């Protein structure tokens, strides 16, 4: 038994160092043809309103860039103004950007200190300076509608979700009709939630992640939930309590959503954030299909995460995520769903 353990540790060490020593380009040679490289750097991809460009961050606390899908030309978006680091970028229905900025001044000793209290700003489409504050703070990623200017966000502390409309008055964006729609204030101290998407095509359901854990980690377990904005009914879409199932980008028809899950891991290796991306049916069955295998292909080093779906439902942008570091990664990839479906038929 001791020899087996030593062999396993040696093999893990070997694979880890091999993955770390490879470049993104060489790693790509191991992947199926329906993956293609967009960038060898950057993280947290976000499609624009026409699915012509992808916005992304250069690092966890950084600036926003965009890449044109056809030309692959990369340009800076937020280099025109000083800030304390941008953590989130989302594209609104009108093409303006919703930014999550961490404070007024950058602290190099603790760059992520404001990660869970981001100030909400609007940067108008085509502009590179003068973002406008909405006077609100959020934790993790907000949800935005693809058909109107409705947004929802998790209040810092991750115990409540608020919803509002963005209205432009004399060209200045403001929040209106603000209200709390979900509250966990009376729940266990180790229960959290996080917004993700309004469900197309009607936007009458908010898709979010329900977390629970313990004093050590409140996010060990997670399930994909839906909250009906008309009836108040809550639906569990994953039905897998012994694993991690964080919801990510939704498909434009509202029939599927992407999730990050560790359901492929043996039970003793679950709840350690060794995740990969899956396509989950939103029919209540809990059925999910794994679309990438980075966490087992490059164990203890890389995973696939942060998937977002374009407006046609044919392409998914995702990142090479680091196993050690929530949301962090390097390199953005394009997943061709038509090519993937064709490859399944050929098997």
Give the positions of each predicted feature.
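Positively charged n-region of N-terminal signal peptides that target proteins for export
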Residues: 1-4
